[in-house]
Amino acid sequence: MSEPRFTRPALWEDVLDLARRLNRQGARYVLVGGYALAAHGLVRMTTDIDIAVAPDPDNNRRWVAALAGLPDGVAAELAGEDDPFAGDLLHAIRINDEFTVDVMPSVAGVSFAILEQHAEQLLIDGEPIPVLDLQGLLDTKQQSERPKDQADAALLREALARLSPAPLLSPLDSGS
């Protein structure tokens, strides 16, 4: 009898491996969630990788093919489906492979088309990864009622405030 297999927490090496697979397939995706925060230097504990994907049939085939190549091949079950999100009330697919990948066509009501406009191409260990920018992360996090997302939103507001240029001072009124 074989040993039961369990999903382990995702590591940065897994993010890089996933990005390589998605890039090789030409998939349109954006890294969101905890690892997107970490890519910007805002580290908090996370155990899965969250990606948003363009929800069209061609791209669905591309990201499914990429994820089907993960060690346990769990995503292969989705091969051949033009719309793997059909009928999914939460509009998220959780791929519990060697590590967990949550795949979403939108995040907190924000469409992939909008998320893609807020993606920055970051080169991480030689791999280009489209990562949701700080403002995009804030926009999605503050839509959530989960305590960890509210904490992330507070951290993002602080980071954005620190990165903003100092406000311009208005000229002093000479009183005349």
Predicted regions and their residues:
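Compositionally biased terminal segments of proteins
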Residues: M1-S176
